[in-house]
Amino acid sequence: MEAHLRPLSAAALLLSPAAPLPTAVAASARRASPGGRRWSSVRASAGGGGWLSGLLGGKGGGGAPTAMTVTPGTVKAGDPVLHEPAQDVAPGDIPSEKVQGVIDRMVAVMRKAPGVGLAAPQIGVPLKIIVLEDTQEYISYAPKKDIEAQDRRPFDLLVIINPKLKTTSKRTALFFEGCLSVDGYRALVERHLDVEVSGLDRNGRPIKVEASGWQARILQHECDHLEGTLYVDTMVPRTFRIVDNLDLPLPVGCPPIGAR
């Protein structure tokens, strides 16, 4: 989920120089075959192909980056890994170099973007892992009225493996959301205001997070990714817009922004 850094223009945010990608990050991507499931390697390196080639330019990967494909290290809407359910991480695999490397990569990509949340499928890894973090610095860029309306408060980095989410109230709210896999766009999405998420931390220990307001929204957004759902699948369609049009009036007949 993208951080809302309002003082930066959309162009400045999207066209910021990309960080060099590590040359030794490999993840497993699930593909269907007549004989059942098989696994293949998706390498996130400057010489890699597949989704990374698309990230770097045209279909063959030879073009220059565009404003719509410059969030470094993320796959984009349309890639099958974003539209299929992710798989549980075996508890015994959590200490492994592979899983810990995936987590480190996710945190680095989220912070570089910058964003406030990321799910493993967004870096091409079909595993149930999410990371999220909202800092005072990120929040300081938002208008005070938005911070209050969204009930947005800073929280430290959270890593949750195999998260299970449940709502803890019937309260909902409509606010604009963005996504690092759908660069440059926003839309209104209705979310529950109070949730509880349980799972395992990066050390394999049980973790439970009770969240409300904006943190609850981030958790729902990232957990949706693990089910193959993007925010555009649940948005109010007529509110979909480019970032530069974020402050334009809503179409007639659209539900109002805020708590329901």
Swiss-Prot record:
The EC number(s) this enzyme carries: 3.5.1.88
Main location: plastid
Oligomeric and partner information: Homodimer.
Keyword Transit peptide found: yes
Chain residues that bind substrate: P114, G115, V116, G117, G178
Cross-referenced PANTHER family: PEPTIDE DEFORMYLASE, PEPTIDE DEFORMYLASE, MITOCHONDRIAL
Cellular localization per UniProt: Plastid, Chloroplast stroma
Region (Dimerization) location: 182-187, 227-245
The organelle targeting sequence, given as a residue range: 1-43
Lineage: Eukaryota, Viridiplantae, Streptophyta, Embryophyta, Tracheophyta
Transmembrane segments: none
Protein name (Swiss-Prot/TrEMBL): Peptide deformylase 1A, chloroplastic
Pfam short name (any one): Pep_deformylase
Family the entry assigns: Belongs to the polypeptide deformylase family.
Cofactor or coenzyme needed: Zn(2+)
Activation and inhibition: Inhibited by actinonin.
Tissue: Mainly expressed in roots. Lower expression in shoots, mature panicles at flowering stages and mature leaves.
SUPFAM superfamilies linked to this entry: Peptide deformylase (SSF56420)
Molecular functions per Gene Ontology: metal ion binding; peptide deformylase activity
Single Gene Ontology BP annotation: translation
Function as written in the Swiss-Prot or TrEMBL entry: Removes the formyl group from the N-terminal Met of newly synthesized proteins.
Reactions this protein catalyses: N-terminal N-formyl-L-methionyl-[peptide] + H2O = N-terminal L-methionyl-[peptide] + formate
Active site: residue positions: E222
Enzyme class: hydrolase
